[in-house]
Amino acid sequence: MESKKLIPEEVHTSVLLNEVIEWLAPKPGGRYLDGTLGMAGHSSAILKIAGEGAELAGLDRDEQALELAGERLAPFGDRAHRFHLAFSKFEAALDELGWDTVDGVVLDLGVSSLHLDHAERGFSFIKDGPLDMRMDPAGGMPPASSIVNKGSYSDLNRILKLYGEEPLASKITKAIIAAREEEKITTTLQLASIVEKAYPAKRRALSRTHPATKTFQGLRIAVNSELEELKTFLDRIPERLSPGARVAIISFHSLEDRIVKKTFKAQSQSCDCPPMQPICTCGKVKLMNVLTRKPVLPTEEEMKVNTRSRSAKLRVAERTGEDG
C-alpha cells in the first residue's frame, strides 16, 4: 500500500502514523482501541480522520502519559476515553464502555520519549537516574534495580540473552555480579558503565549503538513483562473485533515482531486435521486475514525526521466474517 501524507506535520510525531491511518481507514461512527496511548499521536489522528460519531478507548500503564494525552485529546470531548490499564487488560475498558467489539486497533510497542527523556524514570543509559524502568511505578512490580542486585547468575544471564538478545550476556552478567559485590547498583549510568567496561574495546568501536542498549532492553522487557503482555493481548483480541476490523501493531525489535508474525499466521489458518480425515476434530477456525505479508517499514524521509522510527515494523491483520 503506497503511503500518503494524510496527517499534518505538526502531529506527525508517532511512528508510521500515516501508514497506520491508511491501513485502519477510520470511519464515522466507528469504535477504536489504542492499547498504547502514550502522547495520543495515533489516537488523535484516528479520531480526526474518522470524524463524526467515532469513539476511541486509549489505554496506558503510565499515569503521566494519560494526563498528557488528555490535553491532546481534549478537542474530541467525550469521544475519547482514557484508561489506566495495560493493553492486556483491554477487555476491562471495553466492558466499562459497554462495547462488545471495536472496529480497529493500534499498538505502538516502542518505548515512549516520555520515558527516555525523563531520567527519573530509569529507562535511559544516556542520562543518570534511578534504575527503575517500570512503565507503571505504582503497579506493584519490582524495579530493575531489584533484578540487577538480587537476581541469580542464571536469571540475569537468561534475561540479557533471551530478552536483550545480547551476545555477551554471560560476560556482562559476571561483570554485574562482581560490581554489585563491591557496592549496590542503583543508577542507570552506574549500570551502563559496568556494561560498557565489559565490552571489548574493538567491539565498542565497531558498534553503532551504545554497549548497554541490549542490556537495558532485556531488563525493561523483564520488569514490565512485555512479551507476556503482548501474547495475552494477541490471543484475546480477535474475540472483541467486529468483522473486517483491523489490528495494526508496530514493533521495534525481533522478539516482538516474531510474536506478532507467528500469532497472526496461526490465527489466519483454519482446520489443520490430516487431509484424509473425514471429520474435523481440531476445532480450529480462521479468525484473521494477514494483510501485510512483509512488515511495513518507515520511509527514508520519516527515518531522517524521526530517528526512533528506524527499527519500526508494522504488521496488520483483519478480522474475518462472523463464520470465520
Curated annotation (Swiss-Prot):
| TM stretches of this protein | none
Q: Can you tell me which residues bind S-adenosyl-L-methionine?
A: 40-42, 60, 94, 108, 115
List the Gene3D superfamilies.
Putative methyltransferase TM0872, insert domain (1.10.150.170), Vaccinia Virus protein VP39 (3.40.50.150)
Q: Which InterPro entries match?
A: RsmH, SAM-dep_MeTrfase_MraW_recog, SAM-dependent_MTases_sf
> Where is coiled-coil annotated?
none
Q: Name one GO biological process term.
A: rRNA base methylation
**Where is the secretion signal located?**
none
Pfam families, alphabetized: Methyltransf_5 (PF01795)
Domain of life, per lineage:
Bacteria
Task: Write the Enzyme Commission number(s) for this entry.
Answer: 2.1.1.199
Give GO MF terms, alphabetically: rRNA (cytosine-N4-)-methyltransferase activity
> What does the UniProt entry say about where the protein is found?
Cytoplasm
Here the segments flagged for biased composition (Basic and acidic residues) are: 315-324
Region described as Disordered: 301-324
Supply the alphabetized keyword list. Answer: Cytoplasm, Methyltransferase, rRNA processing, S-adenosyl-L-methionine, Transferase
Which chemical reaction does it catalyze? cytidine(1402) in 16S rRNA + S-adenosyl-L-methionine = N(4)-methylcytidine(1402) in 16S rRNA + S-adenosyl-L-homocysteine + H(+)
Q: Which GO terms describe its cellular component?
A: cytoplasm
Biological function: Specifically methylates the N4 position of cytidine in position 1402 (C1402) of 16S rRNA.
Q: Give the family, as the similarity comment puts it.
A: Belongs to the methyltransferase superfamily. RsmH family.
Protein name from the UniProt record: Ribosomal RNA small subunit methyltransferase H
Please tell me the species this chain comes from. Answer: Maridesulfovibrio salexigens (strain ATCC 14822 / DSM 2638 / NCIMB 8403 / VKM B-1763)
Q: Report the gene name.
A: rsmH
